[in-house]
Amino acid sequence: MPKYYCDYCDTYLTHDSPSVRKTHCTGRKHRDNVKFYYQKWMEEQAQHLIDATTAAFKAGKITNNPFAGGPGGAPPKPAGVSIPPPNMGAPPRPGMPGMPYMPPLMNPMMGMRPPPIMNPMAMMGPPPPLGTIPGVRPGIMNGPK
């Protein structure tokens, strides 16, 4: 009977059946080993990217650093380009100074619809009857009788 070998755990299971594999794969040790394997793989990929970037920089393939700041720590602006003023009618962008007490806008949870936006005209109620003054109750127009 063939045995099942788990690469993550570096072990053989007693026999190759779906129930044994399922029990093994749901176990704490197996899940920890899988998590450790992918963490190690991500660290290796990050180190490879760092090494490749460093080698390219030393070889002169990267001439300037796009992340290096200009005077005062701000990145240099291209000639003739100016930053437009903030839109006063729109909500502030995240990180904009001036309103530090405002919480960030939250996205609705998946599957939930956002609350309906009421039309200001719909909140006023029905229009007054013809021949009446808006804002005055109909029984008060001519005074008490």
Swiss-Prot record:
Subcellular location: Nucleus
Keywords from the UniProt entry: Metal-binding, Nucleus, Ribonucleoprotein, RNA-binding, Zinc, Zinc-finger
Keyword set includes Lipid biosynthesis: no
A molecular function (GO) term: pre-mRNA 5'-splice site binding
InterPro entries: Matrin/U1-C_Znf_C2H2 (IPR000690), Matrin/U1-like-C_Znf_C2H2 (IPR003604), U1-CZ_Znf_C2H2 (IPR013085), U1_snRNP-C (IPR017340), Znf_C2H2_sf (IPR036236)
One of the record's GO cellular component terms: small nuclear ribonucleoprotein complex
GO BP field: mRNA 5'-splice site recognition; mRNA splicing, via spliceosome; regulation of alternative mRNA splicing, via spliceosome; spliceosomal snRNP assembly
Region (Disordered): 67-91
Top-rank lineage group of the source organism: Eukaryota
Zinc finger residue extent: Matrin-type: 4-36
Residue ranges, compositional bias (Pro residues): 73-91
PROSITE patterns from the UniProt entry: ZF_MATRIN
Pfam families linked: zf-U1
HAMAP family: U1_C
Oligomer status and interactors: U1 snRNP is composed of the 7 core Sm proteins B/B', D1, D2, D3, E, F and G that assemble in a heptameric protein ring on the Sm site of the small nuclear RNA to form the core snRNP, and at least 3 U1 snRNP-specific proteins U1-70K, U1-A and U1-C. U1-C interacts with U1 snRNA and the 5' splice-site region of the pre-mRNA.
Entry function: Component of the spliceosomal U1 snRNP, which is essential for recognition of the pre-mRNA 5' splice-site and the subsequent assembly of the spliceosome. U1-C is directly involved in initial 5' splice-site recognition for both constitutive and regulated alternative splicing. The interaction with the 5' splice-site seems to precede base-pairing between the pre-mRNA and the U1 snRNA. Stimulates commitment or early (E) complex formation by stabilizing the base pairing of the 5' end of the U1 snRNA and the 5' splice-site region. Regulates alternative splicing of a distinct group of target genes.
Family annotation (PANTHER family): U1 SMALL NUCLEAR RIBONUCLEOPROTEIN C
Family designation: Belongs to the U1 small nuclear ribonucleoprotein C family.
UniProt protein name: U1 small nuclear ribonucleoprotein C
Organism: Drosophila melanogaster
